[in-house]
C-alpha cells in the first residue's frame, strides 16, 4: 500500500469518526441531512431523493441524489465523506439493474418509479 492510500484511509477514518455511513446503492431512496450555514447560525437541511449514481473513489467518493421539487427535477451531488453531510438515512431499497440511473432524467410520473427491493431473507426469519 502506498503512502497516498495510507493517508486517504487515515483521513476517511478521521472524517467518519462518530458517524456511520450506511450501505446504499443506486435506486435507493435516501434522506441526506446537510449542514447549512445561514448568517451566524447553522442548521440541518433534509434532502430526500433517489440515488441515481454512486462513485466509489476512496476519499473522493460521491453520490448523486435526484428528487422532484415543485414538478421540476433537481439533482444534487454529495461528497460521501464531506463534513457538511451530517447523516445519511436509507428510507427504501430500490430494485434496479443498472449502476447509473441517468435514464430517469427523461422520465416523469409513473414511468420514473422504481420497484422496491424485497428482502426475502429477513421475511423468512420473521415467519419462523
Curated annotation (Swiss-Prot):
InterPro entries: Ribosomal_bL19 (IPR001857), Ribosomal_bL19_CS (IPR018257), Ribosomal_bL19_sf (IPR038657), Translation_prot_SH3-like_sf (IPR008991). SUPFAM superfamilies: Translation proteins SH3-like domain (SSF50104). The keyword S-adenosyl-L-methionine does not apply. The keyword Ribonucleoprotein applies. GO terms for molecular function: structural constituent of ribosome. One of its GO terms (biological process) is translation. GO terms for cellular component: cytosolic large ribosomal subunit. Belongs to the bacterial ribosomal protein bL19 family. This protein is located at the 30S-50S ribosomal subunit interface and may play a role in the structure and function of the aminoacyl-tRNA binding site. NCBIfam families: rplS_bact. This is Large ribosomal subunit protein bL19. It comes from Azoarcus sp. (strain BH72). The lineage of its organism: Bacteria, Pseudomonadati, Pseudomonadota, Betaproteobacteria, Rhodocyclales. The gene is rplS.
Amino acid at each position: 500500500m502506498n503512502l497516498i492510500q495510507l493517508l486517504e484511509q487515515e483521513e476517511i477514518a478521521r472524517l467518519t469518526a462518530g458517524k456511520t455511513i450506511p450501505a446504499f446503492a443506486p435506486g435507493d431512496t435516501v434522506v441526506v441531512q446537510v449542514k447549512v450555514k445561514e448568517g451566524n447560525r447553522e442548521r440541518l437541511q433534509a434532502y430526500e431523493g433517489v440515488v441515481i449514481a454512486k462513485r466509489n473513489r476512496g476519499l473522493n467518493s460521491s453520490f448523486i441524489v435526484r428528487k422532484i421539487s415543485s414538478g421540476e427535477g433537481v439533482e444534487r451531488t454529495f461528497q460521501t465523506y464531506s463534513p457538511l453531510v451530517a447523516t445519511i438515512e436509507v428510507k427504501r431499497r430500490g430494485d434496479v439493474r443498472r449502476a447509473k440511473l441517468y435514464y430517469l432524467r427523461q422520465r416523469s410520473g409513473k414511468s420514473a418509479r422504481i420497484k422496491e427491493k424485497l428482502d426475502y431473507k429477513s421475511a423468512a426469519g420473521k415467519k419462523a
